[in-house]
Amino acid sequence: MAALTAENFAALQSLLKASSKDVVRQLCQESFSSSALGSKNLLDVTCSSLSVTQEEAEQLLQALHRLTRLAVFRDLSSAEAILALFPENFHQNLKNLLTKIILEHVSAWRAEAQVNQISLPRLVDLDWRVDIKTSSDSISRMAVPTCLLQMKIQEDPSLCGDRPSVSDVTVELSKETLDTMLDGLGRIRDQLSAVASK
């Protein structure tokens, strides 16, 4: 994620017009969300609370959004690391206030970002049963044991629209396929253990 530009830092100076620290805190909190950038309501609140034009409010909200996202993206959790984002000539008191606010909220923002990120489908539930499948070929009829694997898969809700985000998938596995799959899963488990122990 790219660092903030000089224009972003210039836009942040509009926060000096805030009547209290709580106004700055509220704007920081509300501007983190991606949906905040298109929010007419937040834009109007920013205009009225800071007495700025719509264009200035929009630039400020974009700058706050980038600043808070950058702190989360870079996993900044110390005052020194956050202060280093600002240029030397940035207003000292505002720099300290923004740093304090970011430190207060960075954990919650990180959790929110993880929840809202677009992700691969997730396995929610797994069940299985063993059945005997009657098979016939040209030589003889025979009973073949098979495993029916029933999985509940959760898609990313933001990508599903009106469709339900959880779907059922049933897979039939022969003994040979199951052996191959279990062998592969065993290797995956060993690799995950090796990575986790580093």
UniProtKB/Swiss-Prot annotation:
Does the keyword Cytoplasm feature in the UniProt annotation? no
Occurrences of domain COMM (ranges):
122-196
Q: Name the GO cellular-component terms.
A: cytoplasmic vesicle; nucleus
Main localisation: nucleus
UniProt entry tagged with the keyword Signal = no
Gene Ontology biological process terms in this record: sodium ion transport
For this UniProt record, give its keywords in alphabetical order, as a comma-separated list.
Answer: Acetylation, Cytoplasmic vesicle, Ion transport, Nucleus, Sodium, Sodium transport, Transcription, Transcription regulation, Transport, Ubl conjugation pathway
Report the locations given in the UniProt record: Nucleus; Cytoplasmic vesicle
Q: Which residues carry this modification: N-acetylalanine?
A: A2
| Family statement | Belongs to the COMM domain-containing protein 9 family.
Report quaternary structure and partners.
Component of the commander complex consisting of the CCC subcomplex and the retriever subcomplex. Component of the CCC (COMMD/CCDC22/CCDC93) subcomplex consisting of COMMD1, COMMD2, COMMD3, COMMD4, COMMD5, COMMD6, COMMD7, COMMD8, COMMD9, COMMD10, CCDC22 and CCDC93; within the complex forms a heterodimer with COMMD7. Interacts with RELB and NFKB1/p105. Interacts with CCDC22, CCDC93, SCNN1B, CUL1.
Record's function text = Scaffold protein in the commander complex that is essential for endosomal recycling of transmembrane cargos; the commander complex is composed of the CCC subcomplex and the retriever subcomplex. May modulate activity of cullin-RING E3 ubiquitin ligase (CRL) complexes. May down-regulate activation of NF-kappa-B. Modulates Na(+) transport in epithelial cells by regulation of apical cell surface expression of amiloride-sensitive sodium channel (ENaC) subunits.
The protein's name? COMM domain-containing protein 9
Q: Which organism is it from?
A: Bos taurus (Bovine)
